[in-house]
Amino acid sequence: MANKVGRITQVIGAVVDVQFDGHLPEILNALETTNQGNRLVLEVAQHLGESTVRCIAMDATEGLVRGLEVTDTGAPIQVPVGAGTLGRIMNVIGEPVDELGPIEAEATRGIHQPAPSYAEQATEAEILVTGIKVVDLLAPYAKGGKVGLFGGAGVGKTVLIMELINNVAKAHGGYSVFAGVGERTREGNDLYHEMIESNVNKDPHENGGSAAGSKCALVYGQMNEPPGARARVALTGLTVAEHFRDQGQDVLFFVDNIFRFTQAGSEVSALLGRIPSAVGYQPTLATDMGALQERITTTTKGSITSVQAIYVPADDLTDPAPAASFAHLDATTVLSRSIAEKGIYPAVDPLDSTSRMLSPAILGDEHYNTARQVQQTLQRYKALQDIIAILGMDELSEEDKITVARARKIERFLSQPFHVAEVFTGSPGKLVDLKDTIAGFKGLVEGKYDYLPEQAFYMVGSMEEAIEKGKKLAAEAA
């Protein structure tokens, strides 16, 4: 055992060098030391020669000194998995951070696992109904698929994720795992309390100090944590989700935000002595992303459906970080600042968002044709906007005037009040059934609702509500 102990030789920020005597820990092994009375975990990243390894620290390195003893655990970071994690908050190394005592785990599992083999994967296509009109109609999510939510700062990615957790937990009742990767601690705290309020999780204070009966496990590595924690916390969350999947569950895995995973990797990359690639990102960007994304998949045992918020630096979709994640996704939901500026929420761009599920073979002809007609109408309106800006509406043909009027109604009907946003908007949230969504938009593009004013379609659920609102507006005007 004695030869498994090394000593710290150098500390540079989050990167720590440890020298061993003869024994050399494997790459990705977890090493442990105590820093001012707290357990500190280091993960081996490189072998430097002369029995020295370079490691990434999973917590703050202030207080570490040269010569401090470090022990090799002989395995990657191990985290608790199973039903005991539900309703609890843990950090990257599996320690509880919610002050409710230790997590009673069925087992522990290493955070680095191989991706399921080709033979283990399942490939059937089925859509996951979210109750959000714009998503279900134009870019539907695949059950067991990967979904990316793209958007700049402040266009509503986190609110959309919270609404999805809320809707799917209510409609589908399965387990969820939420990985908070490098996002705001306040939002993490809000999410925990909102989950208790919406009965997704149980309040331990009213449940005899236990979170039993909860539906969602939370794994946090927030903005204030060192890059090591932010670069690994997504893997910790995924490990918890994989365990539920292997037990035959359909799991929802939420990551907010996958960009911070890449960002953390780029922060430690330079300290590890790697030559940066485009825009200063790590040269291993695609490999890191692939190692995470290939594990998020549906097997013959169960499924993982993942929804990942992806921050787009400076609203530039060609930035290497968002671009690296595009290749892995089944559906992309792009949030647009220009739509948010019109006050239309969720600010999903109906022409930029895509899904491989948008096919008549999967959705049926009625849904597919309605979605395509909606996109055609919006695309025509977009093409006419330059003419309208220069010459005004009067110069358009009668046909184009009708198209513009319908497109403006469609734009407004794509908005919807959310349950989790009730506190901001004051209007109760709406969950819209898929057949109501299709019927409503089909009527709109066919001109059945041309008589209603466009305000009637703003922030309503189903078409019945829009008709009701139209009557109310007409009565007020009279």
Curated annotation (Swiss-Prot):
<keyword id="KW-0472">Membrane</keyword>
<keyword id="KW-0066">ATP synthesis</keyword>
<dbReference type="InterPro" id="IPR027417">
    <property type="entry name" value="P-loop_NTPase"/>
</dbReference>
<dbReference type="InterPro" id="IPR055190">
    <property type="entry name" value="ATP-synt_VA_C"/>
</dbReference>
<dbReference type="InterPro" id="IPR005722">
    <property type="entry name" value="ATP_synth_F1_bsu"/>
</dbReference>
<comment type="function">
    <text>Produces ATP from ADP in the presence of a proton gradient across the membrane. The catalytic sites are hosted primarily by the beta subunits.</text>
</comment>
<feature type="binding site">
    <location>
        <begin position="151"/>
        <end position="158"/>
    </location>
    <ligand>
        <name>ATP</name>
    </ligand>
</feature>
<comment type="subunit">
    <text>F-type ATPases have 2 components, CF(1) - the catalytic core - and CF(0) - the membrane proton channel. CF(1) has five subunits: alpha(3), beta(3), gamma(1), delta(1), epsilon(1). CF(0) has three main subunits: a(1), b(2) and c(9-12). The alpha and beta chains form an alternating ring which encloses part of the gamma chain. CF(1) is attached to CF(0) by a central stalk formed by the gamma and epsilon chains, while a peripheral stalk is formed by the delta and b chains.</text>
</comment>
<keyword id="KW-0997">Cell inner membrane</keyword>
<dbReference type="InterPro" id="IPR036121">
    <property type="entry name" value="ATPase_F1/V1/A1_a/bsu_N_sf"/>
</dbReference>
<keyword id="KW-0813">Transport</keyword>
<dbReference type="InterPro" id="IPR000194">
    <property type="entry name" value="ATPase_F1/V1/A1_a/bsu_nucl-bd"/>
</dbReference>
<keyword id="KW-0139">CF(1)</keyword>
<dbReference type="GO" id="GO:0046933">
    <property type="term" value="F:proton-transporting ATP synthase activity, rotational mechanism"/>
</dbReference>
<keyword id="KW-0067">ATP-binding</keyword>
<dbReference type="Pfam" id="PF22919">
    <property type="entry name" value="ATP-synt_VA_C"/>
</dbReference>
<keyword id="KW-0375">Hydrogen ion transport</keyword>
<keyword id="KW-0406">Ion transport</keyword>
<keyword id="KW-0547">Nucleotide-binding</keyword>
<dbReference type="Pfam" id="PF00006">
    <property type="entry name" value="ATP-synt_ab"/>
</dbReference>
<keyword id="KW-1003">Cell membrane</keyword>
<keyword id="KW-1278">Translocase</keyword>
<dbReference type="GO" id="GO:0005886">
    <property type="term" value="C:plasma membrane"/>
</dbReference>
<protein>
    <recommendedName>
        <fullName>ATP synthase subunit beta</fullName>
        <ecNumber>7.1.2.2</ecNumber>
    </recommendedName>
</protein>
<comment type="similarity">
    <text>Belongs to the ATPase alpha/beta chains family.</text>
</comment>
<dbReference type="InterPro" id="IPR020003">
    <property type="entry name" value="ATPase_a/bsu_AS"/>
</dbReference>
<dbReference type="GO" id="GO:0016887">
    <property type="term" value="F:ATP hydrolysis activity"/>
</dbReference>
<dbReference type="GO" id="GO:0005524">
    <property type="term" value="F:ATP binding"/>
</dbReference>
<dbReference type="InterPro" id="IPR004100">
    <property type="entry name" value="ATPase_F1/V1/A1_a/bsu_N"/>
</dbReference>
<dbReference type="InterPro" id="IPR003593">
    <property type="entry name" value="AAA+_ATPase"/>
</dbReference>
<dbReference type="Pfam" id="PF02874">
    <property type="entry name" value="ATP-synt_ab_N"/>
</dbReference>
<dbReference type="InterPro" id="IPR050053">
    <property type="entry name" value="ATPase_alpha/beta_chains"/>
</dbReference>
<dbReference type="InterPro" id="IPR024034">
    <property type="entry name" value="ATPase_F1/V1_b/a_C"/>
</dbReference>
<dbReference type="GO" id="GO:0045259">
    <property type="term" value="C:proton-transporting ATP synthase complex"/>
</dbReference>
